[in-house]
Amino acid sequence: MKYTRYALLFSLFYALYYLIPLELRALWQPDEVRYAEISREMLVNGNWVVPHFLDLRYFEKPIAGYWINNIGQWLFGSNNFAVRIGSVFSITLSALLVYWLALRLWQQRSTALLSAVVFLTCLLVYGVGSYAVLDPMVTLWLVAAMCSFWLAAQSASRLQKVSGWLLLGLACGMGLMTKGFLALAVPVVAIVPWMIWQRRFKELLLFGPLALVSAALITAPWAISIARQEPDFWHYFFWVEHIQRFAQSDAQHKAPFWYYLPMLLAGALPWVGLLPGALQRAWRERSENSGSLYLLCWTVMPLLFFSLAKGKLPTYILPCFAPLAILLAHHGIKIAGTGSKALKANALINVAFGVIAALAVILVLAPWGLVHHPLYAKSEISKVLLGASAFLFWAAVGLACLVAGAKHWRLAALCPLGLALLAGAVIPDKVIDSKQPQSFISAVDNTLKHSRFVLANEVGLASTLAWELKRSDIQLFDRHGELEYGLSYPDAKGRFINLNDFSRWLSEHRREGSVSLVMKLSDDDQYIDERIPVPDQKYHRGRLVLWYYSQQP
């Protein structure tokens, strides 16, 4: 009976966090609409080998993450829920693996369940895990690699050991096909230090080749197939997407070495008060409990590895939160009955965070705020109140944990619930018009659907148009963006129209049908009306503008 009650409560908890909100939030550009459109095109054209984006070659990522997204759209259709369910599915399987590993380590269901809950409610995990990007998928394979190696390392028989190493290779191979060679590097930097500390390096040399073989076997069919269809894929993917992005001085997303420290602290909310003690406990237990050191290696070593890279994004450290969640849960349970101040500190941090964030919404972002250009307009008072309420709910849960003391410290898992349910309803119109063009496109849907040609000046905007209109022939106007490589192929000629050539291009193509030009305006575009032909219709909302040119004989 008790188990049934817990199962029902967990199901409700999971649905409120990870299922109900998915359809309630508009898709964000460029990331979510990009992956939505790539998978839509794969389902339409049936090519599950070569990624295409707006009918152009798109070699920034391998294929396996798209496969998971494809299945989501195949099962649930073309909607926001279907776009995001691949990420949710991946992060859910990761949580189940976290449960499995914690159970193997501590032999306690309560610790294992709490580890999964901590993982699912860490702010970074929830934010990325309910967002349509590929990081949840690669996290799944890295967590699977972490569990597979532990299975091999603790096996009682040679068969189990061999199976564990083979599973490790399969997980790494799938990670490689999801996000690239980092899926091979991360397990190495996490496992090798632990093996050296345990004086088992010889075992690594003996069984490691099994993992390499299984990784090669699972990746070979696709790797060979795409090399045959697109001979330049591996050159571009390895040198441009890996070497330039992570090592060269002009890498994308450059950030200082310490960049991930604040990301880790913010991402560990609402459990960050337990973080110092959890890491310290893992180090203190390193001799008598090799599992604690193993989790510590999987937390710290990838973090250092990503910190050394030139290019950095918060999503890169998502895999670190799986072992960290187990350490946090283990530490929390250990100190719950000892009168430790860490649980009180964690509750106070949540109260402070919720109150400060609510005050920031009311005093800074609101139309009466202290800044000269508030984020919310005067017509969005309800959004201000909802946003503040979401953070005040966070603070209220923190206060409840503080009052209840060590007995109910696990209630911190409810802190992000207000944000989870209300996030889609509190996005300011300024942000919607810039980053969520779906509502703008819906307003001009009839015009766009009857246009023979549709042009967009940003890749993110173009992908949203393609997704909403269910057509992949959107033309790029004036800016290549991330599709510069795909546009360089001879068969992509005519897919890009330069601003200086637009008048001539328009006069030629209006004979074939009407033309819609959709732009997201920047400061450089303030005089755009003077540089393009006068339209037959114009629709302007926020930073988004539609110019419509009817067909001419």
Curated annotation (Swiss-Prot):
The chain crosses the membrane at residues 8-28, 81-101, 113-133, 136-156, 176-196, 204-224, 255-275, 289-309, 313-333, 351-371, 384-404, 412-432. It is a multi-pass membrane protein. It is an enzyme of class 2 (transferase). GO terms for molecular function: 4-amino-4-deoxy-L-arabinose transferase activity; mannosyltransferase activity. Its EC number is 2.4.2.43. InterPro entries: ArnT_tfrase, Glyco_trans_39/83, LipidA_mod_glycosyltrf_83. One of its GO terms (biological process) is protein O-linked glycosylation. Pathway: Lipopolysaccharide metabolism; 4-amino-4-deoxy-beta-L-arabinose-lipid A biosynthesis. The keyword Aminoacyl-tRNA synthetase does not apply. Keywords: Cell inner membrane, Cell membrane, Glycosyltransferase, Lipid A biosynthesis, Lipid biosynthesis, Lipid metabolism, Lipopolysaccharide biosynthesis, Membrane, Transferase, Transmembrane, Transmembrane helix. It is found in: Cell inner membrane. Pfam families: PMT. One of its GO terms (cellular component) is plasma membrane. It catalyses: 4-amino-4-deoxy-alpha-L-arabinopyranosyl di-trans,octa-cis-undecaprenyl phosphate + lipid IVA = lipid IIA + di-trans,octa-cis-undecaprenyl phosphate. Belongs to the glycosyltransferase 83 family. Catalyzes the transfer of the L-Ara4N moiety of the glycolipid undecaprenyl phosphate-alpha-L-Ara4N to lipid A. The modified arabinose is attached to lipid A and is required for resistance to polymyxin and cationic antimicrobial peptides. This is Undecaprenyl phosphate-alpha-4-amino-4-deoxy-L-arabinose arabinosyl transferase. It comes from Erwinia tasmaniensis (strain DSM 17950 / CFBP 7177 / CIP 109463 / NCPPB 4357 / Et1/99).
